[in-house]
Design a protein with these regions (language model features):
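Ser/Thr-rich, low-complexity intrinsically disordered terminal regions
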Residues: 1-130
């Protein structure tokens, strides 16, 4: 029958409501991560290890910078410390070569916050309606 990547039970079958749904990490955080970075090209996505790696993406409005993301889902529970994002940025120098820009921890936190907000929405939407 294959395996279940996402179930619609909200993780209620013996998983303590963790939303793990047949994968190695919290399925709400996993789905939210994919939703949040859907505009970026994926290089690798491992639902069992909880690792998502994107390729470089250049925003259409800025031809002189590009970004790459690594997202790590750190467990099976939906918690604020359950996701880590690392944003890498490169800019073009005067001869047109890409060079690494200084890291900005605020960008990392912004991506993490977006993922957490989406994960909460997914969890709320999965709860039975009263």
């Amino acid at each position: 029958d294959g395996f279940t990547l996402f179930d619609n039970t909200g993780g209620s079958k013996g998983s303590g409501g963790s939303g793990s749904g047949g994968i190695g990490v919290n399925s709400f955080l996993w789905r939210a991560s994919l939703d949040t970075i859907a505009f970026m090209p994926l290089l690798s996505a491992d639902p069992f290890g909880g690792v998502i790696i994107t390729d470089w993406y250049g925003p259409p409005e800025s031809q002189n910078e590009r970004f790459k993301l690594n997202v790590f889902i750190l467990g099976k529970t939906l918690r604020s410390d359950g996701v880590r994002a690392t944003v890498f940025k490169q800019v073009k120098d005067t001869d047109g070569s890409w060079v690494d820009a200084a890291r900005d921890g605020e960008l990392d936190r912004d991506v993490e916050d977006s993922i957490l907000t989406r994960a909460r929405e997914l969890k709320i939407n999965s709860l039975p309606q009263r």
